[in-house]
């Protein structure tokens, strides 16, 4: 959390929308154990529109995503791509195949493991025209992506596959040098059973979500102007 706090931006803040971040810590000093709570509040630039990672287009929702989700990779406070859920990212010589090895201890806030299939499902959902995601064109270099977005091919034909539980492979139609950056900024996993459980309510409030990032969202109802980010204990 220390590194994350360093990367927070406090510029261009506006009044009216307040978020609170809190975490509990246990420190041991001279053999004694001390429990304490840390919290901080800050103002966001606008209201959160959604917690659905496939439908986020505004800055406030994007800030939420950075805190409650973790993608294959992430950007550090110097905007460098560093490992997220993926421990390694490998590109083929021709640039058309990307392979990601995932951490085996990554979990959702409900205790489910984060697997390669969660990334396959999220990309299929993102590019499915039924989702109406405005992020689709970012990933149009994936095999069959244009056809899936047009509805002429099924999402299952997309060039994204889970080789095994913790190995994700992506096939591209042409080399995309910035693809690794895309995996750090616009591709978060989704727990399929949770998406299906909540249906149209998915992402409309804190309670209709599950999280795999360092924090979980609490208290956002979809319309209120304050909420909390709490430490993800998974």
Q: What residue ranges belong to the model's regions?
A:
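Surface-exposed binding/hinge segments that line
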Residues: 137-193
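Aromatic- and charge-enriched surface segment that lines or borders ligand/interaction sites
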Residues: 87-134
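Gly/Pro-rich hinge or "lid" segments in bacterial periplasmic/extracellular proteins
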Residues: 172-234
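Bacterial signal peptide processing site
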Residues: 25-27
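Short, well-ordered beta-strand elements
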Residues: 36-49, 97-100, 119-122, 168-169, ...
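N-terminal lobe/hinge region of extracytoplasmic solute-binding protein
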Residues: 43-93
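C-terminal motif of bacterial Sec signal peptides marking the signal peptidase cleavage site
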Residues: 20-23
């Amino acid at each position: 959390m220390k590194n994350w706090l360093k990367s927070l931006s406090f510029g261009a803040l506006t009044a009216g929308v307040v978020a609170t971040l809190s975490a509990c810590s246990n420190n041991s000093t001279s053999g004694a154990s001390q429990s304490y709570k840390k919290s901080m509040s800050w103002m966001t630039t606008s209201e959160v529109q959604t917690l659905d990672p496939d439908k986020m287009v505004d800055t406030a929702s994007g800030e939420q995503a950075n805190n409650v989700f973790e993608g294959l990779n992430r950007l550090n406070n110097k905007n460098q791509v560093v490992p997220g859920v993926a421990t390694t990212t490998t590109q083929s010589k021709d640039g058309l195949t990307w392979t990601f090895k995932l951490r085996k201890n990554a979990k959702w806030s409900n205790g489910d493991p984060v697997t390669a299939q969660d990334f396959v499902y999220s990309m299929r959902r993102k590019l499915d025209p039924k989702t109406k995601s405005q992020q689709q064109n970012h990933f149009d270099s994936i095999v069959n992506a244009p056809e899936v977005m047009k509805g002429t091919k099924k999402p299952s034909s997309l060039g994204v596959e889970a080789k095994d539980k913790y190995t994700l492979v992506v096939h591209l139609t042409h080399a995309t040098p910035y693809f690794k950056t895309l995996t750090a900024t616009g591709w978060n996993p989704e727990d399929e059973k949770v998406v299906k459980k909540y249906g149209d309510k998915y992402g409309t409030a804190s309670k209709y979500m599950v999280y795999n990032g360092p924090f979980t969202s609490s208290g956002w109802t979809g319309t209120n102007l304050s909420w909390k980010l709490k430490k993800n204990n998974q």
